Amino acid sequence: PRSTPLYSSAASDVYKRQGDNRAADLGLVGNIGMNFQLMTQEIEDRDVPVDVSRYRDQLREREQQLDNARRDQMDSEEVPIDPLRLCREIASCVSDDMIVIGDGGDIVAQASKVIQVPRNGTWMDPGPLGTLGVGMPFALAAQKAHPDKRVLIVYGDGSFGLNGFEFDTAVRFGLPIVGIVGNDAAWGQMMRPQEMLYGEDRLVAVELNRTRYDLVVEALGGHGEHVVAPGEIAPAITRAFESGKPALVNVEIRQDRTGMKGSTYV
């Protein structure tokens, strides 16, 4: 829109530039969180009616449409495994006592569409900057802070390579964290733009191997599972948690070279 009733800016040095990009009836300069807290309190104090049901219902309808469009992938028996089928199987194993951590690019984008975490504060990921490698550090802290909960990491194979050896730390401290690697043998989010711009003969440092990361974790003293068929996923995850050890489930998934299938970022 060309005009908005209200916007909030996070930095005071933009005071003189209010309205440069977007016209406003009222510009507020200050901390975004504090501003919204004050506005919320003002709405309550003035008893202003707020009804977001129409907007919420529109979002729910769009979400359902996207879920229906992805259903064939989520039910796929394809081998290598469809990434969304992997995510569906993971979702079936998520319980109320679980903290889920996403550490990857494509696989986390897919997982976030399918996995329903039980409550606020039970999902963590690299955030908007995509700082890969946070999976095991987040998991170590989460498991130590909440020893009564189960902690699950959803990894891309590339991101596992950054801090995967911290499974050694989990073994030494007896923290039964379970990781699941969506292994497509690629840095997918870098591979596709390279191929699109330069062709498949000019890919640089984006192709990986179908490495047996599960054997790495076993060598460190943990439990490993290697999965190549959709029906094997959920039983492998169950065995991983039941092992009582830090564990890794290494799942071979389809590599989408020309575009991540089902990749609507909504």
Identify what each model region corresponds to.
Residues P1-A11, Y15:
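Single conserved hydrophobic/aromatic residue that forms the stacking wall/gate
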Residues P5, E78-L84, R210, V227:
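Short, solvent-exposed loop/helix junctions and linker helices
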Residues D47-R62, L248:
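Flexible, glycine/charged-enriched surface loops at secondary-structure junctions
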Residues Y55-D67, I253-G259, Y265:
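A short, charged, Gly/Pro-tolerant segment at domain boundaries
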